[in-house]
Amino acid sequence: MDYGLKNLGNTCYMNSIIQCIRYTGLLSLDDDDFIQNCIKTEKRNEFGLMREWLRLQKSFIIENDTKCVNPIDFYKSFAQNISRSEYTFVGFEQNDAGEFITILFDLLHKCLKYKIKLSVQGDIKNNLDRIAVDSIDYWKKFFENEYSYLIQSTYSQLLSITSCPKCDYSTRNHDPIQIITLHMKPQFETIYDMLSHYTSVETLDSDNSWKCDKCKENVNPEKKIVFWNLSDILIIQIKRYDSNLKKIDRHIGFPILLNMNKFCMNYAEQSMTYKLCSISVQSGSLNGGHYYAICNTDIDNKWKVFNDSNVFDIDFSDMMQQKPYCLFYKRI
């Protein structure tokens, strides 16, 4: 059912993100991996948050004459969990949608987390194999004691390579990433331009200079970031505010089918093609803006606007002219 969500007073940013998540299929009642994780950890109830999330998901599939779901119980549980956590959140005041994604996923992850054993199979035959072993070691460090369906589905792995410009010495580091944050520049026209810049070689300044362990020279090292592995769900956030908090309100081209081959090492040889499921759009300014979602519905393959309780069709051409703040892609 393509139901809207009631605005409870400046909750448009939360409503927008929940609709975007919903149309990826993530954390849904139809997702067997999610349900199995819920069963495995059902005794862990973070102040009712997972229970209220499941009830909210059920509300989306029950016949409702108003065509609108009231998320009050879930938002109350979310606020209670925030009050017991280390997060600073302003309740039902205007907040950042990207911040809401991070906190929501972390709180739900705490409901789902469990221990997992990670091990390396096979022999190391080349440098890529060595990097793969290192990546698993880093993954164990971050997640072996707190793994979950959400880690599996939404966390990618970055590989940063810092190298000496005077010899072939380099160091590597792996980091998990859940939201890919891309910065706008005047010359960028598409998301591909932004991703190319994100993964380009950067010469570090004198504040970050170091003495090379191999040639012993003091150098300004070169740093390059690539994706080592990519998650099934990709969340891309476009930073639309400059250092003075002025909104950069211009269109950036975004594809329906996103090809990440150019930006990922893809050691696991997975598909690097992603389909756009939903976008979150912010109109207005940072402090006085309004969020709404545009999602690709499963049944009729139409694009629809979810503006709080209002739901209506949007032409494909109009959707492609939107200026999204967050984009949700799913591996195909």
Each model region followed by its residue ranges:
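Exposed substrate/partner-binding surface patches
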Residues: 1, 21-25, 30-44, 136, ...
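USP/UBP deubiquitinase core
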Residues: 1-128, 184, 233-238, 316-324, ...
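Beta-sheet entry/capping signal
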Residues: 11, 161-163, 233, 292
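Conserved S/T- and glycine-rich ATP-binding loop of Class I adenylate-forming
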Residues: 104, 164, 212
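Intrinsically disordered, low-complexity regulatory segments in eukaryotic proteins
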Residues: 124-142
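Folded extracytoplasmic luminal domains of secretory or organellar precursors
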Residues: 156-158, 165
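Residues immediately within or flanking Cys/His clusters that coordinate Zn2+
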Residues: 159-161, 209
